[in-house]
Amino acid sequence: MRNHPSLPIDADRLWRSHEEMGQLGATPKGGVNRQALTAQDQQARALFTQWAQAAGCIVETDCVGNLFARRLARDPDLPAVCTGSHLDTQPTGGKYDGAYGVLAGLEILRALNDAGIETERSIEVVAWTNEEGTRFAHSGSALFAGKADLEQAYNATDPTGIRFEDALTAIEAKGPLPLGNRPYDSLFEAHIEQGPILEREGYSVGIVTGDRKSVV
């Protein structure tokens, strides 16, 4: 990408997007219950697709419902830069867990459009399937990366006995793309802090340098 001044984003637009997305599965106390492959998840996918297409993106879905929105570059054959997260939530989830990573990525694409900037590499925003894992054991990102078996995932059931593949089909989320055939130059995920440190120290953003594993 050529050097440009800092790219201004439209914070009000990003906020409005969160508020609108947050209405899908909204709970009385301000949270969100938008579990993977439910009617609410289907609505969220449709809304993201609508916004991404309005921003000029090519939107595609793979065979486990991972949703990809790509803004093409001068050289579309170069491996893309990818960012994103997930739109599904826990039963008692929040508006910003996961959704922020998807909508922040979308806002970058919108801001690039506003500034008339053409990038050297395509930029792709992804919404992974079932990242919270409240209904099914396998996440879309693990399947994409080849870390889980597709047939086992398809046959996995939620607590009510619904198969993963059947749930995909029921909300028309099973796409034609094979798993993993999308080379990336780099991948980033923006995520809300799930702890007190940044807020306590007065920082607006932090960079993750490692994982901490919790044992319950």
Regions found by a protein language model. Name each.
Residues 207-211:
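Short Gly/Pro-enriched turn/cap motifs at secondary-structure boundaries
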Residues 1-9:
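Basic/polar N-terminal segments that are highly enriched at the extreme N-terminus
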Residues 8-94:
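Acidic/His- and Gly-rich active-site-bordering loop/insert found
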Residues 90, 100-205:
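Acidic/histidine-rich catalytic neighborhood of metal-dependent amide-processing enzymes
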